[in-house]
């Protein structure tokens, strides 16, 4: 019996050779726990201002493309372009993104920071696409979560219900939200969130269900089609003139034609 390190070459040997192989214990895949990762790495982004955190979320896709072009280092952290095996302590773009969202949600506990986040995040395209009303701290927290990795964030204490309710909403409304199931499987994401909750023995007691219903009520009041209606209303005076040319009587509000 031979014990070897888990590498690409040793996996090939495992699959093609007749000799007995075992991987060294410390090389076995370690179960990743984002809650632990979060506690150990939140300090890495403590210098980021709230505005900078919001800038990251607003430009997430563009930032991701740049970071993934090559190994990306900030401070003492490096996000590798390619990795045969991502370890439990390695930083990835998704983990960084989740850290920033957790940081922002925690900042909503301060009224001044809450107002700053509320005013800035309202202009983010994803929030407008969801038609999410930003009336209180809970709605702002939902806004911060939009586009994030719910299975990762669900492992953090106090983030369980907001994650599972948002996952359910996305699964129920994926067509209205314009989510392509071939690119993002909402049911699979919900399953992953539930798996995380089960692994941490999370109990959906009466208090947790009450909290979940509050988040669900906010999401129920959102209007995924509002973005187009708002944009149409902005140009309503001019657009209505063209409607009249097509024999449609001018309305007080263009959105009434929808």
From Swiss-Prot:
Transmembrane segments: none annotated. One of its GO terms (molecular function) is RNA binding. Keywords: Capsid protein, Helical capsid protein, Ribonucleoprotein, RNA-binding, Viral nucleoprotein, Virion. It is found in: Virion. GO terms for cellular component: helical viral capsid; ribonucleoprotein complex; viral nucleocapsid. It comes from the Viruses. It holds the Pfam family Tospo_nucleocap. Signal peptide: none annotated. The N-terminus and C-terminus are involved in homooligomerization and play an essential role in viral RNA synthesis. Homotrimer. Binds the viral genomic RNA. Belongs to the tospovirus nucleocapsid protein family. Encapsidates the genome protecting it from nucleases. The encapsidated genomic RNA is termed the nucleocapsid (NC) and serves as template for transcription and replication. The NC have a helical organization. This is Nucleoprotein. It comes from Tomato spotted wilt virus (strain Hawaiian).
């Amino acid at each position: 019996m031979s014990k070897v390190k888990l590498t690409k070459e040793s996996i090939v040997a495992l699959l093609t050779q007749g000799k007995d192989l075992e991987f060294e214990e410390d090389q076995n895949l370690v179960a990743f726990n984002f809650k632990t990762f979060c506690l150990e790495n939140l300090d890495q982004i403590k210098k980021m201002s709230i505005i900078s955190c919001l800038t990251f979320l607003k430009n997430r896709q563009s930032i991701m493309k740049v970071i993934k072009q090559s190994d990306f280092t900030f401070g003492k952290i490096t996000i590798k372009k390619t990795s045969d095996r991502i370890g439990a302590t390695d930083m990835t773009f998704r983990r960084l993104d989740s850290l920033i969202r957790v940081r922002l949600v925690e900042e909503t506990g301060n009224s001044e920071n809450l107002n700053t986040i509320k005013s800035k995040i309202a202009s983010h395209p994803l929030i407008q696409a969801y038609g999410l009303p930003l009336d209180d701290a809970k709605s702002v927290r939902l806004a911060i979560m939009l586009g994030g990795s719910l299975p990762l964030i669900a492992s953090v204490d106090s983030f369980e219900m907001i994650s599972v309710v948002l996952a359910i909403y996305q699964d129920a409304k994926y067509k209205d939200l314009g989510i392509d199931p071939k690119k993002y499987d909402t049911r699979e994401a919900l399953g992953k969130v539930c798996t995380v909750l089960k692994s941490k023995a999370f109990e959906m007691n009466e208090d947790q269900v009450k909290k979940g219903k509050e988040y669900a009520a906010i999401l129920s009041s959102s209007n995924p089609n509002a973005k187009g209606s708002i944009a149409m209303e902005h140009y309503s005076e001019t657009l209505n003139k063209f409607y009249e040319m097509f024999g449609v009587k001018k309305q007080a509000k263009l959105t009434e034609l929808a």
